[in-house]
């Protein structure tokens, strides 16, 4: 669990670092650049695992790498370009509930009544947050929607990724998935980039290195290492930590303005996700086969 908490602390700062990187280059190019930086780190390690991967594991490895790095990162960081870092971090707070609902519909992990209640409350919180953006704070509906879509993809592949990591090992999966994703990302970064101009700055360069080394490689390495020891549902519940730190950093580091209405919506979303974590621990377990729990 320690590895995943540390990775969430790193990821919570990724949107803040990305805002600095956007002053230097386009969002799609930024995603490509951070993956390329990660490749230089993992490339020496990749060689030792290439011949050890069974042939029947390459197809799921390629698909999960494409979804986890290319699709998720493109959706979230292009969406971030249109909305504030604080609102983006708040929307990321929906991840635990998305994890539960996706598990309910696709993986037979039944959601309880309080999950549905928390999900409805969190959705209302997002609506309030976006509505409050009209009073200031640069909160954009389409930007938030793209980030939610990226989160939905991430939560959908958590269980298959966990199974693949159990077969290959976290070091092999992390290094190889980063390497192949950098190649698969190239046509999409060129297609989706609105500008190919690069305006060098120290703040943008340092932010890009941080995104490539810490957020792309080290953060995923920690997360994948922790996934081999932590159930998928618990992994989803740990994600409630990310928006809390992210919102605080957005206000302190970026000096982002949050209107009263948007702040209320953010609090509702974070509180709903937190309630989804706490309620299973405090409520009595449902009786099985007619017997008392």
Predicted regions and their residues:
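Glycine-/small-residue-enriched transmembrane alpha-helix faces in small-molecule transporters
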Residues: 1-29, 136-163, 183, 288-293
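Hydrophobic alpha-helical transmembrane segments of multi-pass integral membrane proteins
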Residues: 2-3, 29-44, 63, 114-124, ...
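Helix-helix packing/entry segments at the starts of transmembrane helices
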Residues: 31-33, 73, 88-94, 160-183, ...
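Hydrophobic/aromatic residues within transmembrane alpha-helices
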Residues: 21, 30, 34, 79, ...
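Specific transmembrane alpha-helical segments of multi-pass solute transporters/efflux pumps
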Residues: 10, 14-15, 43-92, 128, ...
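Specific alpha-helical transmembrane segments that line the substrate/conduction pathway
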Residues: 29-40, 77-110, 115, 150, ...
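Hydrophobic/small/kink-forming positions within alpha-helical transmembrane segments
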Residues: 9-12, 16, 65-70, 74, ...
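Hydrophobic transmembrane alpha-helices of multi-pass small-molecule transport proteins
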Residues: 42, 102, 111-133, 151, ...
């Amino acid at each position: 669990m320690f590895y995943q908490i540390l990775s969430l602390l790193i990821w919570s700062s990724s949107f803040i670092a990305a805002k600095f990187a956007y002053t230097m280059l386009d969002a799609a190019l930024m995603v490509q650049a951070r993956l390329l930086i990660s490749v230089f780190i993992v490339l020496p390690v990749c060689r030792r695992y290439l011949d050890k991967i069974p042939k029947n594991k390459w197809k799921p490895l390629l698909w999960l790498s494409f979804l986890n790095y290319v699709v998720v990162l493109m959706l979230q960081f292009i969406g971030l370009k249109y909305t504030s870092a604080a609102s983006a971090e708040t929307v990321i707070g929906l991840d635990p509930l998305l994890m539960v609902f996706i598990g309910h519909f696709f993986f037979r992990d039944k959601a309880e009544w309080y999950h549905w209640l928390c999900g409805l409350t969190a959705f209302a919180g997002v609506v309030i947050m976006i509505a409050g953006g009209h009073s200031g704070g640069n909160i954009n509906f389409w930007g938030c929607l793209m980030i939610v879509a990226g989160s939905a993809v991430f939560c959908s592949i958590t269980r298959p990724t966990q199974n693949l990591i159990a077969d290959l090992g976290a070091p092999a999966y992390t290094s190889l998935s980063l390497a192949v994703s950098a190649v698969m990302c190239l046509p999409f970064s060129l297609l989706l980039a609105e500008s190919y101009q690069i305006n060098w700055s120290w703040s943008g360069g340092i932010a890009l290195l941080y995104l490539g080394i810490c957020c792309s490689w080290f953060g995923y390495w920690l997360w994948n290492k922790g996934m081999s020891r932590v159930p998928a549902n618990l992994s989803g519940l740990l994600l409630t930590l990310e928006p809390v730190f992210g919102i605080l950093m957005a206000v302190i580091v970026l000096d982002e303005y949050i209107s009263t209405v948007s702040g209320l919506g953010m609090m509702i979303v974070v509180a709903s996700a937190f309630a989804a974590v706490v309620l299973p621990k405090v409520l009595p377990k449902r009786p099985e086969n007619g017997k008392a729990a």
